[in-house]
């Protein structure tokens, strides 16, 4: 019952803040709970959801390359402007940090920070116009911060 109330609260915050992706995800989980199929489907989502979500996200990002709307010439021009070069460098950094964050949460087993990451992502998506992909980057920054402080 408590978990249903928490997901319902997330749904309300998401709807109020117009965070459609969070609202849709919370709605899906609520429907699965109400249909009492959560014990069968939640383990699959929990185990493979991140992987399949990333596959779909990356596929969506790669569609312009697959369609041919982004050419080799376009890719070459990326390195000719400071904005393109900055985007490339920042992409390297944030992708690396996301990987560190995923490892921090899963391999290293620091799941105790997950509630704070979820709450921050939901609030940022609902009220700051953010997109809730931040928990991996956030946990990556956290992993680097923890490593840095451990060396002091």
From Swiss-Prot:
InterPro entries to which the protein is assigned, alphabetical: UPF0756_TM (IPR007382)
Keywords: Cell membrane, Membrane, Transmembrane, Transmembrane helix
The UniProt record lists the keyword Cell membrane: yes
GO annotation, cellular component aspect: plasma membrane
Family matches, as Pfam families: DUF441
Bilayer-spanning residue ranges: 5-25, 41-61, 75-95, 117-137
Membrane topology: Multi-pass membrane protein
Top-rank taxon, per record: Bacteria
Location in or out of the cell: Cell membrane
Chief location category: membrane
Signal peptide segment: none
Family stated for the protein in its record: Belongs to the UPF0756 family.
Database matches in PANTHER family: UPF0756 MEMBRANE PROTEIN YEAL
Protein name, entry field: UPF0756 membrane protein Moth_1009
Organism: Moorella thermoacetica (strain ATCC 39073 / JCM 9320)
